[in-house]
């Protein structure tokens, strides 16, 4: 799962940057490693996700579909983390109540 998450994170960053070198700088990963990850993801999905040119990359139709889904997933993760942080700030915890018999 972690491997797939990393591939989708790389895919998402390349799509946002619209070029591999920008994504490599943002992710602190070499350009060849980015290219290899994208190729691995494309191979596992059985489709081409990017059109490649000397000026950068652009999403294919399947790439656009995947981008929306990955973006939604990342937003859901972020929202979940924010909800957990709010929960923790509320001081939710264990409450003990003692009563005595009269």
Spans of features found by a protein language model:
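A short LG(V/I)-centered, amphipathic sequence patch enriched
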Residues: 42-64
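Interdomain hinge and pocket-entrance segments immediately C-terminal to HTH DNA-binding domains
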Residues: 85-102
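The N-cap/first-turn positions of alpha helices
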Residues: 4-7, 31, 63, 70, ...
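Short helix-boundary/capping micro-motifs
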Residues: 12-28
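Residue cluster at the C-terminal edge of the helix-turn-helix DNA-binding motif
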Residues: 17, 26, 39-48, 81
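Short alpha-helical "packing" element that flanks the helix-turn-helix/winged-helix DNA-binding module
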Residues: 7-14, 66
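Alpha-helical linker/hinge and terminal dimerization helices associated
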Residues: 44-45, 66-88
């Amino acid at each position: 799962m972690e491997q797939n998450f990393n591939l989708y994170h790389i895919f998402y960053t390349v799509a946002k940057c619209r070029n591999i070198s920008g994504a490599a700088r943002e992710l602190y990963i070499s350009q060849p490693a980015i290219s290899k990850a994208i190729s691995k993801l494309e191979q596992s999905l059985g489709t081409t996700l990017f059109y490649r040119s000397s000026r950068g990359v652009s999403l294919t139709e399947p790439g656009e579909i995947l981008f929306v889904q990955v973006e939604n997933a990342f937003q859901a993760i972020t929202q979940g983390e924010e909800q957990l942080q709010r929960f923790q700030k509320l001081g939710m915890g264990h409450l003990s109540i003692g009563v005595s018999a009269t």
